[in-house]
């Protein structure tokens, strides 16, 4: 990604959506696509799609559209999916167990390799292909395995404490499923997943924009 262009955060958050859709076209043997087809499938305005893509140079040609293979190569490079991304999860309650069981089965290049909890009845369990470790091993293991990305599913009351430990371990990205906001240094990216807000947003759009 060019260091000369400031890419809007909203654009970056749409890249995985584009990638998943283009991957589905590839699996169907389709070799090119235009912005209207992407718009119809993802319900994103065509102008927004063209603007998003324009930040990354000439990805397509007017009158032709976008080559599927070229788009896939681009998205893989931007989303770091050309290399295996190892992920850890902290907090193996109901949500944590569900995520471990799912373990990004549709993504060949992302996998949860480590899981941590404080509960004695959970530590040592094998969930999916991952054995749950004691939180006491958190910092040491993350450093040793060079894990940069962590999914946080702990109780809210300990979320900040765990986040501080993640920063100490060198983690650069946290997907926070806890209700509370966590504070981290500016070089650590935090994405807050609030299911209540997402559902409220969904209901709003259903009420106001459904045909």
From Swiss-Prot:
Recorded GO CC terms: cytoplasm
Function per UniProt: Modulates transcription in response to changes in cellular NADH/NAD(+) redox state.
Protein name: Redox-sensing transcriptional repressor Rex
Assigned keywords, A-Z: Cytoplasm, DNA-binding, NAD, Repressor, Transcription, Transcription regulation
Assembly behavior: Homodimer.
Organism listed in the record: Staphylococcus aureus (strain bovine RF122 / ET3-1)
Family indicated by similarity: Belongs to the transcriptional regulatory Rex family.
Residue numbers binding NAD(+): 91-96
Ranges of the DNA-binding region feature: 17-56
Top-level taxon of origin: Bacteria
GO molecular function, one term: DNA binding
InterPro entries: CoA-bd, NAD(P)-bd_dom_sf, Rex_DNA-bd_C_dom, Tscrpt_rep_Rex, WH-like_DNA-bd_sf, WH_DNA-bd_sf
Gene3D superfamilies reported in the protein's UniProt record: NAD(P)-binding Rossmann-like Domain (3.40.50.720), Winged helix-like DNA-binding domain superfamily/Winged helix DNA-binding domain (1.10.10.10)
Entry's localization field: Cytoplasm
Record-linked Pfam families: CoA_binding (PF02629), Put_DNA-bind_N (PF06971)
């Amino acid at each position: 990604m060019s260091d000369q262009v400031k890419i809007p955060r909203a654009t970056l958050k749409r890249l995985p959506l584009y990638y998943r859709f283009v991957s589905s076209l590839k699996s169907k043997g389709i070799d090119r696509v235009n912005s209207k087809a992407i718009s119809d499938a993802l319900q994103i305005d065509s102008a927004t799609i063209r603007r998003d893509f324009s930040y990354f140079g000439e990805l397509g040609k007017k009158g032709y559209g976008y080559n599927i293979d070229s788009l896939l190569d681009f998205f893989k490079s931007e989303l770091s999916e050309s290399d295996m991304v190892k992920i850890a999860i902290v907090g193996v309650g109901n949500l944590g167990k569900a995520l471990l069981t799912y373990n990004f089965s549709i993504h060949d290049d992302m996998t949860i390799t480590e899981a941590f909890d404080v509960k004695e009845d959970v530590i040592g369990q094998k969930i999916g292909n991952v054995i749950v470790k004691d939180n006491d091993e958190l910092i040491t293991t993350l450093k040793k395995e060079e894990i940069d990305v962590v999914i946080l599913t702990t109780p809210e009351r300990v979320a900040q404490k765990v986040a501080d430990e993640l920063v100490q371990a060198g983690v650069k990205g946290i997907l926070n499923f806890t209700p509370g906001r966590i504070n981290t240094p500016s070089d650590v990216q935090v994405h807050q997943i609030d299911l209540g807000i997402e559902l409220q947003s969904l209901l709003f759009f259903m009420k106001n924009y459904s045909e």
